[in-house]
């Protein structure tokens, strides 16, 4: 290379034009750019020697302007068509002759720039450039089009994000939803999310940190999620929505109900007065009760259970969907149903004043509460009253002469409870609460009283479960029996030391084994029954629905739809789903409890020390009596079981699942 040679070199990846000035050592050259800046560069930094005479640094601006006149990337396509036909490569000088019919320095450098920046038509081999095949060019064009389209989509997405962050309403495109769903998965599942890299790329491109917390914050700012989004639910496999196919099947079922297999066997019980008793907010009404006066002076109790299997067949679309869900999930913000809403609250429910299909349990009791005789029937009923628990409590308190049946049913429920206690039933009376969150995210926690109406319903449902179990056991029908091993309770003298009420009940409760499901009957210790199944919530629990399928098939003399092994497999699968649903319910309730307490941090709560969790660490369980909520707390001083404390929330963060209390200490004024 000689002094005055015009060349291109690279500095930090950028193209620079300079003129060779002098050698620097054995290999390097000092070059000077148009601004007079001198740099010593090794040969490897020199990208292209333009040549064409002796140049001065001041010539560079005019040279660059001259080159720019020839920089038309579209001209390469014409050259490529010629060269691919001839199957030959070119260097920049030859390309200059082909494109511009001359090989002067500006033409040559323009050709070099076009070739070196081209990613479509040519590939470099040494100092020459070979034409790609037509197939390769077509594929690269397709890739470029895809990338251009992707960049356009990204630009549009960013624009919509900025609009939404500014408070404007936007309509998300399908491609936007893919990005948003990736953010949702990442916010909920963190590094376990398969979409995490996609989400991180989106966050980084928007100038945000690529953490799950940042994804959550962005979703809240975009109003895609609430500040109180249920991450516990989103981390599970619980399906929140029904598929289009299931909804279509549900609608067909509503419009064109299938033939009733039990039409000829349904007992007409529309003459009976039927009471359905639920919370005011309950929409899936799956049980009702009646009392019938017999000619011999005895009274017959009827427990009517909704008959959703009237609309289903084992293994059909709706049945399999219900089996997959296994249970309705009840959350403070609403429920995730087992069946589509219109079906569950419509023809499946026991709706007031409408003809309803039911599975009715008839029973005559001894004065002691023991079962004298019973029968089970598919039936048609017409619910008379849709009552709340408060309604029934008021009716019982007033002793309405117009409704003697409800008082009689309540009296029988007390006898039933006494009989179960005589059979070894274990009564645990602990405060319970209802937690509701409305559409404005206002939280209400209501203490549920252990009132006569709730006792009435509970005893009637337990009675139906006993009758269903007796029938299945007598006729060798495989159903999901529920059992509970006998607990080892603390000695009587140890229990008597504890304060009566929640403290004593808590000591008993901690000794109770979990109930178990199996296809063979076993004793249920806490209920005091030798055999028991759940049959009273077939709209909300798949185990109940399964029992209905089996019992109804036997009643009409058909083969059982499910053999023992099939029932066992289903019991195992729904058991896992129910445990997951229970965990979601518990953790979601806890979240809203902590949020409620955070919002009421100025209030003083009366608490009782229930039991020790780790006494050596002063960690125990407390009960906030006003709202019936149990929480763990590490006591800052020595306390005893049953002690009452006045507490105030010192710190609460429901998202981090943390709450700390401080005890209020009152000083007595000295006279």
Residue map of PLM features:
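Electropositive, intrinsically flexible nucleic-acid-contacting patches
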Residues: 21
């Amino acid at each position: 290379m000689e002094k005055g040679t015009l060349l291109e070199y690279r500095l930090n990846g950028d193209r620079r034009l300079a003129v060779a000035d002098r050698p620097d050592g054995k290999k390097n050259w000092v070059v000077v750019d148009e601004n007079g800046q001198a740099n010593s560069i090794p040969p490897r930094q020199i990208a292209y020697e333009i040549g064409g005479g002796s140049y001065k640094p001041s010539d560079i601006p005019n040279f660059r302007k001259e080159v720019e006149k020839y920089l038309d990337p579209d001209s390469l396509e014409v050259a490529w068509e010629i060269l691919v036909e001839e199957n030959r490569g070119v260097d920049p000088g030859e390309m200059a002759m082909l494109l511009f019919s001359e090989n002067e320095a500006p033409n040559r450098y323009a050709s070099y720039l076009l070739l070196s920046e081209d990613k479509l038509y040519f590939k470099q081999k040494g100092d020459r450039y070979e034409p790609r095949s037509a197939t390769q060019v077509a594929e690269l064009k397709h890739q470029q089009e895809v990338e251009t389209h992707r960049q356009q989509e990204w630009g549009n997405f960013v624009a919509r994000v900025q609009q939404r962050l500014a408070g404007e309403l936007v309509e998300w495109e399908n491609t936007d939803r893919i990005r948003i769903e990736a953010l949702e998965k990442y916010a909920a599942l963190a590094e376990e999310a398969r979409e995490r890299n996609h989400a991180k790329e989106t966050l980084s491109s928007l100038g945000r940190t690529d953490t799950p917390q940042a994804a959550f914050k962005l979703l809240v700012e975009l109003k895609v999620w609430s500040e109180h989004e249920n991450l516990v639910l989103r981390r599970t496999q619980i399906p929140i929505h029904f598929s289009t196919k299931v909804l279509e099947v549900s609608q067909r079922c509503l419009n064109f109900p299938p033939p009733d297999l039990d039409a000829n066997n349904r007992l007409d019980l529309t003459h009976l007065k039927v009471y359905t008793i639920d919370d005011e907010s309950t929409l899936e009404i799956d049980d009702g009760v009646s009392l019938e006066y017999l000619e011999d002076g005895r009274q017959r109790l009827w427990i009517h259970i909704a008959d959703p299997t009237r609309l289903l067949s084992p293994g059909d679309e709706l049945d399999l969907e219900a089996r997959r869900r296994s249970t309705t999930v009840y959350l403070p913000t609403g429920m995730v149903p087992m069946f589509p809403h219109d079906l569950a609250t419509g023809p499946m429910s026991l709706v007031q004043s409408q003809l309803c299909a039911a599975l009715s349990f008839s029973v005559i009791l001894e004065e002691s509460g023991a079962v004298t005789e019973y029968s089970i029937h598919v039936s048609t009923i017409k619910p008379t009253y849709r009552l709340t628990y408060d309604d029934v409590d008021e009716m019982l308190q007033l002793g309405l002469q117009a409704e003697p049946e409800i008082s009689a049913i309540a009296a029988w429920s007390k006898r039933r409870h006494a009989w179960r206690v005589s059979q070894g039933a274990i009564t645990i009376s602990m405060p319970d609460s209802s937690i509701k969150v409305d559409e404005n995210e206002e939280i209400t926690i209501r203490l549920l009283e252990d009132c006569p109406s709730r006792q009435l319903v509970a005893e009637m449902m337990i009675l139906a479960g006993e009758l269903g179990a007796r029938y299945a056991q007598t006729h060798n029908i495989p159903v999901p029996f529920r059992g509970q091993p006998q607990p080892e309770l603390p000695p009587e003298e140890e229990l008597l030391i504890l304060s009566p009420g929640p403290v004593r009940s808590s000591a008993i409760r901690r000794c109770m084994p979990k109930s178990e499901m199996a296809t063979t009957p076993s004793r249920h210790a806490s209920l005091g029954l030798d055999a028991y199944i759940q049959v009273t919530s077939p709209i909300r629990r798949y185990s109940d629905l399964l029992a209905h399928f089996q019992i109804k098939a036997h009643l009409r003399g058909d083969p059982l739809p499910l053999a023992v092994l099939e029932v066992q497999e289903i019991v195992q699968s729904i058991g896992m789903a129910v445990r997951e649903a229970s965990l979601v319910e518990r953790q979601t309730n806890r979240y809203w409890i902590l949020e409620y307490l955070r919002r009421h941090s100025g209030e003083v709560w009366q608490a009782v020390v229930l039991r020790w969790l780790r006494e050596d660490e002063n960690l125990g369980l407390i009960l906030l009596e006003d709202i019936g909520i149990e929480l763990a707390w590490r006591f800052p001083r020595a306390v005893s079981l049953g002690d009452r404390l006045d507490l105030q929330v010192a710190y609460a963060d429901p998202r981090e699942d943390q709450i700390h209390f401080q005890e209020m200490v009152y000083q007595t004024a000295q006279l």
